[in-house]
Amino acid sequence: MSHHEPCLRQGEEYKYLRGKNSVYGDAWNFRTNREGITKFWEDGLKRSGKFENVITVGMRGEADTAIMGKNATLEDNIQLLRDVLKTQKKLIQEHVNPDLTRVPRMIALYKEVEEFFYGDEKTKGLMGAEELEDVILMLCDDNYGNLRTLPTEEMRKHAGGYGMYYHLDYHGWPVSYEWINSSYLPKIWEQMSMAYDFGVRELWMVNVGDIATQEFPLSFFLDMAYDFDRWGSRALNCTQEYTRKWVRQQFGSVEEETQDTIADILEQY
């Protein structure tokens, strides 16, 4: 599963398989290379569709970019995505399971895709679209650990449910933060507790970058997702307790005084 690579195929695969004589064509463009892109997705579903997956649907540009150029209108982008979603829906029914309610699928409403979902006062977005009826709608943070949006009471009726794409690491504009953990556990607790309380419970995804140095916040994020009753919104001020617990797990062979020092450093950094 990827937040932007649909139908169980990675963008890097297309990079190496594309070409003038390739069955997949030579352009990551659903308008000019519809047959090649459809074949690329179809082969991904044939190869991996019977395994346990959450299948990403939708389409973005190469390397985590917007799919259409700057001259494209909001309506242009929305109509393209509708066409893409209809094609992917048919492929998944043919090669994975005709009963789509038994196939976990998600679309990440990340960056420009969020705008295509909501639309504006003149252009109806994809919210409520038949093509997304049973699809998990993955909301996103702002790349810096702050939730951008949460489902309203009316939106929570969506059959596919909601997910959250959260960042502990980010490489991109306007500011990257990588390699050294700078994610404050109380903030993770606050934001993800809020997400859960607003019905975001189907799928949590976290961008951890290079795992080394991010083990601490990653462990908390995963433990919170696995046992929300223990570490979630009812567990007020639990992050200090979690820090001590995690330090004991990682540094159990050192003296208790040293463990306390390590925990203090983690809490105060």
Located regions from the model:
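Solvent-exposed loop/turn segments at secondary-structure junctions
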Residues: 6-9, 62-64, 113-114, 143-145, ...
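A generic structural motif
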Residues: 2-8, 102-109, 139-140, 165-167, ...
